[in-house]
Amino acid sequence: MASSTINTLKPTANRSTARAARAALTPALLALAGIVMVGAVLRFNCLDCYGLWYDEVSSVQVAQRGVVAILTDRFGWMRVQTPLHYLLVWLSLKPLDPTTSAVLVRLPSVLAGLLTPAVVYGLGRETFGRAQGLLAALFVAVSAVHVSHSQDARPYVFLALFTALSVYCLLMCERTGERRWWFAFAAATAANLLMTYHALTLATPAIAPYLLWVLYKVWRGRDAEGGRVRLWGAALSLAAIGAVGVVMLADILGVPRVPPDLSLFSPASVGDQLGRMLNRLGQVGVEREAEKTLQWFVAGVAFLGVLFGVRERRFRAVTLCLLMLVVPALLMAVLRTTNSVFQRYVLFTMPFYFLLLANGILAARLLLRATWKWKQAGRAMSGALGAGALVLFGLGLYVYFSPEQHKQLSFLPDYRGAARYLTERAGPGDLIVLLEEPPQGMQVLDFYWHGTPPAPTFDGIDPRLHAQPAPRNIYWVMTYALNDPKYLEALRNASPPGHNFASVAEFDRLLVLEENNPGDVLPSLRRMADRMTAANPPFSPSLQALFTLQGSLMQARGDTQEAASLYRTAGPFYLLGDEYLTTAEGFHTRGDRSAAWREAIMSLFLEPYRPQIHTYLAQLLNEEALSPQSALEQQVARDLEFRN
């Protein structure tokens, strides 16, 4: 009878436990739904306020080449992104011309961005607890940095989503041992690998140590009930991931990059990369010194989260988060020895940083719990830290959505507005000259003009520019990084008598300066270079850009040795010259001379001291019957080789 009573009550007890669990879960899910809605509002807000920028246009133009070209004919920098990324962009282009509106092109990133907080909540629930998961999800939802990438038609927000989802599935594999979670882990990881190469080079290596630990536990428990089934599920999942990884590795080996040089690596560079990474993840976009102070505060609270996690014996959670932060910093430091790396590559580390931050905030309420009064003080401290963090994120959103301030958080020059303005003003007898750092405007303006500019358009360092006849007007398109009126005033004050600007059009991060009856092109370009030199400190453009421009002017005058000296002084802007030179050669082979010139000029700007670039430019000039300019390029190449 007793046995019967126990058996009767056991299902009832289980049902009661399940009901209690559901009752406890409901408020958390409602809060999570609210967080996702807030994130959606922020990511859809002002989605088309700015036109597509250089990287987005690059993705769009590769996608516009068609499915066959995406799968079989990528070359140069086109191979930096995966076919799946380009196919997704290709699909988004079908309903609407991206030069008319950027909404549909950016929509996939928006959707990935608003789903990420939900996955972050799951991560928090499986590591530190439900409250930490909700708080970290809220931080991701209102992070201006994450919002910025969610409004960018690039794959970085997908990398963050799929990495978080992969880790969540792995945690569920560890806790439940169910095959479905192994298959979900394989699917999420494969999607990550197919979407971006950074999943292969940065995210997967960060996950690998924890994955090995989980696999060890599965192997150790293989003789337990269901152990063999779990082992086979893990093995099949790893086989699928390995197959996708091998395919993507074979593809990435075609990217023209220089292998890392470990002789240039130092342990201090890991700390430097970690600091840069954390600064970017929590960035709010204020003045540099204030930003540094705020990020030290955020990092300090996250460190408190590490200490409290260890104190509460949450070793698994702390280890996982630290792996996801330290391993990418290490890999970035190694890659940086010979390549340019950018902090957007490690956006996927944000959820793990914010989990530590959330744990640090909630830990404060438990540090002081000896008496009731101390408990109240601890709760007040925790509330103050949480409120302070939300104020910081709110400040970041204000800066990001303020047209006059968002420049600190994202690079969104208004090429769309400048293209419309120039279409209305410039004509066949005019000349449009771009003076930028780096020279991205040629590609973006050409995109918005559908390949038909209103007037001949050249970058300021293009050697063809010096052979152009005297124009009626010159429209100077300049990078205006600081949007500081003092820079414009300095340019005007540096103008020689009789050569003031007839009109000035200001766009976000761009200036369009109209100069009437400028005379011959080369003297006009020299005057503009002198203006920029006089106005430079402490404004944009950088000295590197000015050295390259001055070198091109010396080259046009025939002083190739001085030109070579200036090119060497300029040094590299980014170590990406090979990618762009290879891309130029690819376009040249396919008969697209306009694109070949554009990529060659970008390569020249990035690494002007490389003889190979000048040799290639000499070839292009010779094909256009510009023999004097071709001879000068060849001589510069020889001078650079001699000095090297």
Question: What is each of the regions a protein language model found here?
Answer:
Residues 37, 107-127, 165, 307:
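Transmembrane-helix motifs of polytopic, lipid-linked glycan transferases
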Residues 196-198, 246, 386-515:
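Catalytic lumenal/periplasmic loop and adjoining terminal transmembrane helix
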Residues 37, 116, 120, 210-221, ...:
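Hydrophobic, aromatic-rich transmembrane alpha-helices
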Residues 12, 126-131, 166-184, 216-220:
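Membrane-interface transmembrane helices that cradle and orient dolichyl/undecaprenyl
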Residues 33-34, 238-240, 297, 301, ...:
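Signature aromatic-anchored transmembrane alpha helix within multi-pass, membrane-resident enzymes
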Residues 149-150, 159, 201, 293-296, ...:
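Hydrophobic/aromatic-rich transmembrane helices and adjacent perimembrane loops
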Residues 39-40, 136-137, 149, 181-197, ...:
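Membrane-interface alpha helices of multi-pass inner-membrane proteins
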Residues 44-52, 68-90, 94-106, 339:
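Membrane-proximal lumenal/periplasmic loop motifs of glycosylation machinery
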